[in-house]
Amino acid sequence: VDYTHQFNKLDLNIAGNFGLSNFNFKPGSANSKQKFTSGDFHAGIHFIDETAPLRFNAETNLLMYERQHNMLNEHTDNTSLKETIIRTKGDVTGAINDQQSVTIALAMNNFLYSGYTKNISTGDEYFKNYTTLLLNPYYELDNDDWKLHVGANVDLSFGFDKTFRVSPDITAQYIFSDSYVVYAKATGGKLLNDFRRLESICPYGELADAHLSSTWGYVQRPYDTYEQINGTLGFKASPYPGVWFNIYGGYQNLKNDLSYSAFGRASVTHFESYLNFSQDNTDNLYVGGEVSYDYKEIVSLSAKYTYRKWDSKTEEYLLAVKPASEMSFNVRIHPISALNINLSYDYINREEVEGYAKMAAINDLHIGASYNVFKGVSVYAQVHNLLNKKYQYYLGYPAEGFNFLGGLSFRF
């Protein structure tokens, strides 16, 4: 649910979401099933008068998430972990003149944990409440030739993880001949490894054990990943109306990069396998390009390719799930106002690690369509894996063959 009310100079936005994911692991796994329950509430105000000398935005969010089963303890009475995040964000922008402005942005996350977080017999706690604070001041210039964004990310953490980190927040674009752009950027910042991000990386992943024999069966929260730098140089051009191409190359450095790998253990009667979240410092060099064409918003075509070369300091096996090359192609057709049709192809080849099983490359040809039946009511459908290929989104878990998804969307 997402509702926005527009005032003269302000937008008020209220939104809420609920999610439930209940699924089984593959045969032979240490756990046989998992259940994720999530919900969130959002309320914010957005100042929309761009001519005002002083503008502001503010929002607050309440996010809740429960992981029902954790680390090889499915048969224990209660191993659920509950995560509550109180997220507050705001920024204030002051205009220097029509082309220049200065902004100070703040974001605070309060993490609260309950459930299977503490060893009752020893008192050791493996999921501690903590707070993160981001300070992001920046200067912006926007004129006919230059677009500059110069700032810094100052990340503080209280109660868990490294206390102080700093990364750049810089983007520069030079525009010439109206449709040619040379750009450079150096960005970074904290990537919160909350339960939602764990699910997005691998829903079948188990949290890391606390590593002490006296605490066997208890798990711990991963450190937050920090993007120390993601620097890119690129060139964009539009030599013909509706046509754009973009070539780029860059370097990314990640501290405590979150990944996962396959492990196994021998039980009394059989061998059990599981996927375990792990972390290491990684970096990667990347180059790529993309081209797009749009004809009067009726037909649009786009293609993109990126190649990456990864390196891990100590845990090279974690790179086996990383993308080595990514290619995509998309065709969008909008023949009438009510109908949208998409045909897309995605190919993702994973990094090859010596002595470790290579994941089958993602090879997905899919088609989708949406149609506005009435005002605010639309019907949609998607069909994936039209080629009926065998590949893996997650290590050891083959993707479905030819599959279909459809539904209704309401907007009021």
How would you label these PLM feature ranges?
Residues 18, 62, 78, 108-110, ...:
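Amphipathic alpha-helical scaffolding segments
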Residues 45, 62-68, 80-84, 91-103, ...:
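Phosphate/ribose-recognition catalytic cores of enzymes acting on nucleotide-derived substrates
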